[in-house]
Amino acid sequence: MSRGSGAGYDRHITIFSPEGRLFQVEYAFKAVKAAGITSIGVRGKDSVCVVTQKKVPDKLLDQSSVSHLFPVTKYLGLLATGMTADSRSLVQQARNEAAEFRFQYGYEMPADILAKWIADKSQVYTQHAYMRPLGVVAMVLGIDEERGPLLYKCDPAGHFYGHKATSAGMKEQEAVNFLEKKMKENPAFTYDETVQTAISALQSVLQEDFKATEIEVGVVRADDPLFRSLRTEEIDEHLTAISERD
């Protein structure tokens, strides 16, 4: 692969190319897309929903052991898009950090603090020669006692932002375009509308109708702030509602 004046600058993570690029960080973003899945996050007025594809790479695998949705605490969920091994490593460290936070301060770690910690960690990985960036984009969701529903996205470069709706993975840009139209009027989605907007966004950009076993859906609600993954029957109900609406 020819990069002209960029050649040779992809061997060391800490060296900028003459154009001001860090190739290894750019490759980490490509690794996220190369995983071949697309994820969506949508924030409603009293809930947050994240949806991703559930692809089982091998017919002999136990389907229940394949997941991109992780509880960090009882109240915080994380949807990881990208390399599975990197995701699990990040989640394990995040759980340790959240437990340490609760022990030290006496209350649960808020979603924005967790997102900042993940972003800080990712940013440090872009500075040291003996590390590599994580090939993961993490969406963090939770209900804040003061600020209500929160949805954050953290990327391999160390950015983290709060979102009304967002996407990651293979069809990220197409999903963002779809969500921008849906969120144009700044709608105050109910819980059902939030879940169905996220699922229909995924169906629209991938141009396929999913079965309940082909996607994962994670939610938090203001009236029940515990993070949980929806059961297959619950996903089926939302898929039916979407097909009837369309």
Swiss-Prot record:
Any one of the GO CC terms: proteasome core complex, alpha-subunit complex
Source superkingdom: Eukaryota
GO molecular-function terms, A-Z: structural constituent of ribosome
Main localization category: cytoplasm
Record keywords, A-Z: Cytoplasm, Nucleus, Proteasome
SUPFAM superfamilies, sorted: N-terminal nucleophile aminohydrolases (Ntn hydrolases)
Statement: the UniProt record of this protein carries the keyword Cytoplasm: yes
GO terms for biological process, alphabetical: ubiquitin-dependent protein catabolic process
Localization in the cell: Cytoplasm; Nucleus
UniProt keyword Cell membrane, yes or no: no
Xref: Pfam families: Proteasome, Proteasome_A_N
Coiled-coil residues: none
Annotated SMART domains: Proteasome_A_N
Biological role stated in the UniProt entry: The proteasome is a multicatalytic proteinase complex which is characterized by its ability to cleave peptides with Arg, Phe, Tyr, Leu, and Glu adjacent to the leaving group at neutral or slightly basic pH. The proteasome has an ATP-dependent proteolytic activity.
Subunit structure: Component of the 20S core complex of the 26S proteasome. The 26S proteasome is composed of a core protease (CP), known as the 20S proteasome, capped at one or both ends by the 19S regulatory particle (RP/PA700). The 20S proteasome core is composed of 28 subunits that are arranged in four stacked rings, resulting in a barrel-shaped structure. The two end rings are each formed by seven alpha subunits, and the two central rings are each formed by seven beta subunits. The catalytic chamber with the active sites is on the inside of the barrel.
Similarity field: Belongs to the peptidase T1A family.
Name of protein: Proteasome subunit alpha type-6-B
Phylogenetic classification of the source organism: Eukaryota, Viridiplantae, Streptophyta, Embryophyta, Tracheophyta
Gene encoding the protein: PAA2
